[in-house]
């Protein structure tokens, strides 16, 4: 029997038709979220669109990378230069990839390189215990970068126990990880974890005219995590954690002795104190990150003449406070950040430093059926001065189980150090006059519980001014500059329901992202997205089925070197996974990714994986 997308979706639709009124548990879910306003609150109370992904979700989906996880979420589009370990870009609600603020345990992720884009392909999935996603502007809460949204990756698990996992898959995929969380006495929890992941990969550019590009492009990652939490009293505790990873990936150079290997090294150390008593809580955290990114030619070696290095060190100090009030919560704090970037090759080196101090105030208040939310923030940056942002939202529960939401928010994106001061090794000239990108978004939404279906509908418009773009002269010396603006309009609907043994999740999205100067659609954005996920348990086996459709997009925007846009066709992906608990401690899992073996590209000329098979086993104790 031939398996088709239509037949699989028909099976899902049949299951969906079996709805029974059991969806209220999801509406009354007490899942807590911190990222929206920097204080803990139930997901159902947040006025911004948000998602919480747990480690249990990641294991059920049997995701192999962070991009696998993010692709399932509402409002998220992904472009990647091939398979595992290859450069990836995540677009939230049509905003640029650099317009997403990425936090690790609430601390901004250090990003090397000139673009200011977080490369999700380099963040090991084994580190992640939980992900919180907020869609829409959040600069009034966190400062720069949060134009399209915020992704907070949480690495800590406070539950004692341990787990060992081993897995194999297509293209000689291997996965091994172990974690142990042990209580020492009544007040101390010690955690240690490590992971290894590798794949032989495949040739990501089979159409390349260069013989050196005919090899496989593999990936290897090693990860560690260690931490200790100690409680001095019921109100005072302290923590320290350190983690890091080393990644090796291969890619295609395009010419003899060109860079075709990448090595990334990251290590992070964090420590802090937490105080909580009655209505008041406070947390003080210090973090140090070091991120080194090498690119080199395999024919010349890591220390050969063609090697380049981006070496970023980042220090963060955060002091946050929250007070529970009669009708809600008030939060205020200070963020300090120092970045130092050294970018070099054999002949040239560029060094930059930046300091930023931010002051924020956020609140949410409840008055009968009205919920009000607001935030103010000011950032003092030694390179581009003072920048203020604000946002406000109101929710009205106009009838039981239904709420109307209106929000407005401003945001900004600071130029990177490399964009402002150039990188001579990359023939990028300086432009210290670059202005910060600024945006303002207005959004309306309605959400409700209709029978078994919990649903959310949002309509939004995001206007981004001073967009930063790149151009080069006739000698190929380039510079970054501010262009006019872009406007992104969108509508998204998401819903979920429990029907007997089945749990359904559906996302429908349409966006219209355009440059204002010529009405051209922005590159790498699928204007239509349809996503369906079905989870169920039968005969003690947990099943997961995911169907995703991404509409057509464009690979580029026009410039002096590209007179037209290259159209990228839409594509459909289907994944299927199953897990069986052999004992109360041992679970075996299997997955077929890209079940229909679709041949598609998200970046022109870069092949994506075909059908792949995975098998793993986990032992918990």
Residue spans for each PLM region:
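N-terminal periplasmic "start-of-domain" segments of outer-membrane beta-barrel proteins
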Residues: 28-61, 89, 97
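Gram-negative outer-membrane beta-barrel transporters
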Residues: 326-327, 365-372, 459-463, 481-558, ...
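Extracytoplasmic beta-strand/coil segments of soluble accessory domains associated
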Residues: 67, 71-107, 129
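Structural signature of Gram-negative outer-membrane beta-barrels, strongest in the C-terminal barrel
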Residues: 233, 326-331, 335-465, 505, ...
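Periplasmic-side early beta-strands and strand-to-turn transitions of outer-membrane beta-barrels
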Residues: 139-140, 152, 159-163, 167, ...
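Short acidic/polar hinge/loop motifs at secondary-structure boundaries
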Residues: 108-135
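Outer-membrane beta-barrel signature, preferentially recognizing the C-terminal barrel domain
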Residues: 256-272, 276, 310-315, 383, ...
């Amino acid at each position: 029997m031939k398996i088709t997308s239509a037949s699989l979706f028909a099976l899902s639709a049949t299951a969906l038709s079996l709805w029974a009124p059991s969806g209220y548990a999801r509406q009354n879910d007490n899942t807590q979220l911190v990222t929206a306003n920097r204080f803990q609150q139930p997901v159902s109370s947040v006025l911004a669109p948000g998602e919480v992904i747990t480690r249990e979700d990641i294991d059920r989906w049997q995701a192999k990378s962070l991009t696998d996880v993010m692709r399932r979420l509402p409002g998220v589009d992904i472009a990647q230069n091939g398979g595992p370990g290859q450069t990836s870009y995540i677009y939230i609600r049509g905003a640029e990839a650099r317009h997403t603020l990425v936090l690790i345990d609430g601390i901004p992720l250090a990003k090397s390189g000139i673009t200011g884009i977080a490369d999700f392909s380099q963040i090991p999935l084994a580190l992640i215990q939980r992900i919180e996603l907020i869609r829409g502007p959040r600069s009034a809460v966190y400062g720069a970068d949060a134009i399209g949204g915020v992704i907070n990756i949480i690495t800590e698990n406070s539950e004692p126990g341990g787990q060992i996992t081993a897995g194999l898959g297509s293209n000689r995929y291997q996965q091994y990880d172990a974690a142990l969380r042990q209580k020492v006495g009544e007040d101390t929890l010690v955690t240690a974890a490590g992971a290894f992941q590798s794949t032989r990969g495949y040739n990501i550019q089979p159409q390349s005219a260069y013989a050196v590009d005919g090899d496989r492009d593999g990936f290897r990652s090693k990860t560690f995590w260690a931490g200790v939490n100690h409680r001095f009293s019921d109100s005072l505790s302290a923590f320290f954690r350190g983690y890091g990873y080393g990644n090796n990936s291969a890619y295609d150079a395009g010419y003899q002795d060109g860079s075709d290997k990448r090595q990334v090294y990251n290590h992070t150390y964090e420590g802090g104190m937490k105080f909580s008593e009655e209505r008041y809580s406070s947390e003080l955290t210090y973090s140090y990150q070091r991120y080194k990114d090498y690119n080199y030619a395999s024919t010349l070696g890591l220390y050969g003449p063609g090697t380049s290095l981006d070496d970023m060190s980042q220090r963060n100090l955060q002091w946050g406070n929250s007070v529970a009030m009669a009708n809600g919560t008030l939060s205020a704090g200070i963020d300090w950040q120092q970045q130092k970037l050294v970018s070099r090759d054999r002949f040239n080196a560029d060094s930059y430093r930046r300091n930023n101090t931010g002051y924020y105030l956020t609140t949410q208040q409840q008055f009968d059926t009205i919920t009000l939310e607001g935030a103010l923030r000011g950032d003092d940056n030694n390179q581009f001065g003072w920048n203020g942002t604000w946002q406000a939202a109101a929710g009205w529960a106009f009838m039981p189980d239904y709420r109307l939401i209106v929000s407005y928010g401003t945001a900004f994106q600071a130029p990177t150090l490399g964009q402002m001061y150039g990188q001579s090794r990359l023939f990028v000239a300086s432009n210290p006059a670059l202005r910060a990108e600024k945006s303002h978004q207005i959004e309306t939404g309605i959400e409700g519980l209709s029978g078994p279906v919990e649903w959310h509908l949002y309509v939004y418009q995001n206007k981004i001014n001073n967009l930063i773009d790149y151009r080069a002269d006739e000698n190929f010396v380039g510079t970054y500059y501010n262009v006019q603006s872009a406007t992104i309009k969108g509508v998204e609907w998401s819903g979920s329901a429990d029907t007997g043994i089945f749990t359904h999740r559906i996302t429908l999205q349409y966006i219209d992202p355009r440059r204002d100067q010529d009405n051209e659609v922005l590159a790498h954005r699928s204007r239509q997205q349809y996503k369906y996920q079905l989870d169920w348990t039968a005969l003690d086996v947990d099943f997961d089925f995911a169907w995703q459709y991404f509409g057509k997009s464009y690979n580029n925007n026009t410039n002096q070197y590209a007179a037209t846009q290259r159209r990228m066709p839409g594509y459909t992906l289907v994944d299927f996974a199953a897990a069986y608990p052999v004992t109360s401690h041992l679970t075996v899992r299997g997955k077929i990714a890209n079940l229909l073996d679709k041949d598609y590209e998200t970046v022109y000329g870069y092949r994506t994986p075909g059908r792949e098979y995975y098998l793993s086993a986990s032992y918990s104790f």
